[in-house]
Amino acid sequence: MMLDGSALRITLDNFCGNEPVHLTRATVAVSDGADGILPETLVPLTFSGNAGVTIPAGERLQSDAAAFPVEKGTTIAVSLYFAEFTEMRSGVVITGPLSGGYFAVGDQTANAVLDTDTSKKTHTVYFLSDIDVLTAAENRTLICFGDSITAQAWPDYLMERTLQCGDGTTAVIRKAASGTRILRQYDNITYDSYGLKGETRFPREIQVAGADTVLIQHGINDIIHPVGTDVNRFRPWSDLPTAAEMIEGLRFYI
């Protein structure tokens, strides 16, 4: 966490889902710095007072606010359990020294340490879109928005630098989806995981509590993806934008 706070809530998003997602249980706790949590900090999260919730396709929702004191520099663990077969279409892959998680079989939301035989490390984050912290009014959020470049490590290093050298009033968060472009998106199963175009993503993803600045690193895939149908039938030269189209796409963000 990059800010001190007294309570938090999470946002779950089924943006790309084709069907409802049924969450059975969610918890939050302070991480032990490895593959477990500090059990005395474990707090169940609720949704309108209920342990579970259904997220309709294309929708998102927030948990109830939970009393959860945090200090700047603390690492927390949010655990989600889905008892039913779940379509995992809404998620992103992120890497970096501050990013990562675990995928596990069964309900391990209250486990102090994950069972090594039924869990594995992952860089894919499903459904968890935001973690809001109740903090001082003068604090703010900076959003790093982009594609695979931003899904990699540099936002984490910016977070570390901000924690070390900042004034303690700014949180840095990441909104990145690998393979995405500003102007176009793929309409085939081969590149379905490359996600939505910026025009679709941006208005939704910048709706973050306390955000007043967006740092954009986006557009390289618009340029490098088209290679001609003789090389890749899904990447025609007609997808290559003009300079004017790219400028107009970036102006949409502004």
Question: Which residue stretches match the model-derived regions?
Answer:
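N-terminal secretory targeting modules
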Residues: 1-145, 150-151, 156, 164-168
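Conserved SGNH/GDSL esterase-like catalytic core that processes O-acyl groups on lipids
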Residues: 20, 26-29, 35, 131, ...
